Amino acid sequence: MAWFFAPEPVMVTADEALKGGRHPVLENPAPHTVLGTPVTGPWKEGQQRIWIGLGCFWGVEQMYWQMDGVEGTSVGYAGGFTPNPTYREVCSGRTGHTEIVEVVYDPSKISLEQLVARGLEAHDPTQGFRQGNDVGTQYRSAYYTENEEDAARVKAVVDAYGETLKQHGFGEITTEIGVISPSEYFLAEDYHQQYLDKNPDGYCPHHSTGIPCGVEA
C-alpha cells in the first residue's frame, strides 16, 4: 500500500502574495447578532481590543463573545500581506493571513492576560501551521495587539505557558505575537460573522491540550 502525504504548508512571501481587492469584502457590517454592539465601532471610552488566532475562527469567536467583560467580537484576517482578502483567497495560503477574531473588551471587567490565557487553553499552540485536521498557514496561532506594551504582556503569558507545556511533554510554542494597526485587520464576509449563532448546529472544534494556563480569573 502506498501512502501519500501532503507537503507541509509554507508561509508565502510579500512578493508571492495575492494582490488583493480595492474594497473590503464587508463594508457595512450589521450589528453583532448576540451582543447587539457595532462591529466596527464607535467603541465606548476605555474599551480595548486584541486580535486572536486559534485556528478556525467560528468557534473562537463564540468562545469570546460568551466571556464576561467582552463587549464586541468579529472575525476576519490579519498577519499577512494581501489587502481586502476573500475567504477563498485566505484559504489558498497565498495571502499570508491567519483567521482572526477581534475581541473588544472592558479592561475593568476582564484583563488582557485572562483573554490570552483562555485562548491558549482552547487550542494547541505547538502545532505550527495547523489545528487538528485543519492544515494551512491560515490556521496558525497568533496574538496581535495595538502597541508594544500589550504585546509584551501577551508574550509573558505565552512564554510562561510554553514552559508549562514543556513540563508535560509538548514541543515549542509556535504562537506568533505582533503589533498591528486596525487597518491591517480585514473583516471576513458576513456569512462568517457570529457563524455559530446563525448556524447553531455548525461544527468548529477546539483542540485544547488540556493543560491549564494558571492565570487567575
From Swiss-Prot:
Annotated InterPro entries: Met_Sox_Rdtase_MsrA_dom (IPR002569), Met_Sox_Rdtase_MsrA_sf (IPR036509), MsrA_MetSO_reductase (IPR050162)
SUPFAM superfamilies cross-referenced by the UniProt entry: Peptide methionine sulfoxide reductase
One Pfam family cited in the UniProt record for this chain: PMSR
The reaction(s) this protein catalyses: L-methionyl-[protein] + [thioredoxin]-disulfide + H2O = L-methionyl-(S)-S-oxide-[protein] + [thioredoxin]-dithiol; [thioredoxin]-disulfide + L-methionine + H2O = L-methionine (S)-S-oxide + [thioredoxin]-dithiol
Keywords: Oxidoreductase
Residues in the signal sequence: none
Keyword Oxidoreductase among UniProt keywords: yes
One Gene Ontology term from the biological process aspect of the record: cellular response to oxidative stress
EC number(s) from the headed UniProt entry: 1.8.4.11
GO molecular function, one term: peptide-methionine (S)-S-oxide reductase activity
Keyword Chaperone: no
Enzyme class of the recorded protein, top EC level: oxidoreductase
Catalytic residues as annotated in Swiss-Prot or TrEMBL: 56
Disulfide bond sites: none
GO cellular component: cytoplasm
Domain of life, per lineage: Bacteria
Function: Has an important function as a repair enzyme for proteins that have been inactivated by oxidation. Catalyzes the reversible oxidation-reduction of methionine sulfoxide in proteins to methionine.
HAMAP family recorded: MsrA (MF_01401)
Matching NCBIfam families: msrA
Family (UniProt): Belongs to the MsrA Met sulfoxide reductase family.
Listed name of the protein: Peptide methionine sulfoxide reductase MsrA
Designated gene of the protein: msrA
